[in-house]
């Protein structure tokens, strides 16, 4: 077939303009009647919507592309596996999967290392209004599927709140409260709409995490967090991941078994854990 470069360029331009008009920022997306679907990972939302309209010919309620289940067992690790979790404190996706990630580690017995990174816009990655709007609406759909009461009240923690929390993180981690500090920050920002940019908001985060606010205040302006957070970013990039949350599952030799990006990939990590433990059990019998 003969290709007309000028016609192709015009077609691409028109399509990009239409996509922007409909409220999205990226390609390879599905759009149906006012709602966007990010590739095959979101088709189950579309399937459910079409089923509600009675559009499925066989009247079956079985999905073609269901959201894969996050399996929490039955096998349990005994010191062989390590899961590295890369969250950020401004990420809606991080906020809906943070507790599930901790639960997976606890129930399977794997070692969990939380490696926070700066939010993308604080790393110099540009973000459009369309992108921000889509991410919030998509995270709300995903949270509903996970049966999480999320996003009814949100107070964007961009900037100083994130830096303040990261400034406290090394101290909190040494106190055995690092996970709790991050969790409470996300809870306040994305579940309760608390202004973490206020003294009272940050004080609430700290005290909910089981830490002393008087001690915390003296650590807010220490710079020890910066090399740690930057190292985490570089490590994440080395895995071929750029966004959050990202995951790396490795064995006792430090070899990467799975490295992946997205809250909608925790199911993959969970299955990789069970597959590894099953193979190890079989080889030892």
Residue ranges of predicted features:
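Structured beta->alpha junctions
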Residues: 34, 89, 156-157
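C-terminal cap of thioredoxin/glutaredoxin-like
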Residues: 1-73, 79-84, 97-104, 184-285
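Surface-exposed loop/turn and secondary-structure junction residues enriched for glycine/proline
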Residues: 40, 46, 92, 120-121, ...
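Active-site oxyanion-binding pockets that recognize sulfate/phosphate
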Residues: 2, 87, 125
């Amino acid at each position: 077939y003969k290709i007309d470069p000028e016609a192709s360029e015009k077609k691409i331009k028109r399509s990009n303009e239409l996509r922007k008009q409909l409220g999205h920022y990226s390609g390879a997306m599905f759009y149906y009647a006012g709602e966007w679907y990010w590739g095959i990972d979101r088709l189950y939302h579309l399937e459910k919507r079409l089923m509600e309209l009675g559009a499925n010919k066989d009247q079956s309620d079985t999905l073609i592309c269901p959201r894969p289940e996050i399996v929490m067992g039955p096998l349990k690790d005994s010191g062989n596996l390590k899961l590295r979790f890369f969250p950020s404190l401004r990420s809606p996706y991080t906020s809906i999967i943070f507790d599930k990630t901790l639960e997976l580690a606890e129930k399977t017995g794997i070692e969990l290392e939380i490696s926070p990174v700066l939010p993308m816009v604080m790393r110099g990655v540009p973000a459009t209004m369309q992108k921000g709007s889509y991410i919030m609406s998509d995270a709300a759909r995903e949270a509903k599927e996970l049966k999480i009461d999320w996003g009814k009240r949100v107070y964007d923690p961009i900037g100083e709140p994130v830096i303040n929390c990261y400034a406290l993180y090394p101290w909190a981690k040494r106190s055995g409260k690092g996970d709790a500090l991050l969790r409470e920050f996300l809870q306040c920002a994305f579940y309760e709409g608390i202004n973490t940019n206020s003294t009272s908001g940050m004080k609430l985060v700290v005290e909910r995490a089981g830490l002393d606010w008087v001690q915390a205040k003296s650590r807010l302006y220490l710079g020890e967090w910066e090399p740690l957070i930057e190292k985490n970013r570089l490590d994440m990039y080395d895995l071929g991941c750029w966004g959050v949350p990202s995951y790396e599952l490795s064995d006792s030799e430090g070899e990467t078994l799975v490295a992946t990006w997205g809250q909608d990939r925790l199911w993959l990590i969970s299955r990789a854990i069970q597959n590894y433990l099953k193979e190890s059990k079989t080889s030892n019998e």
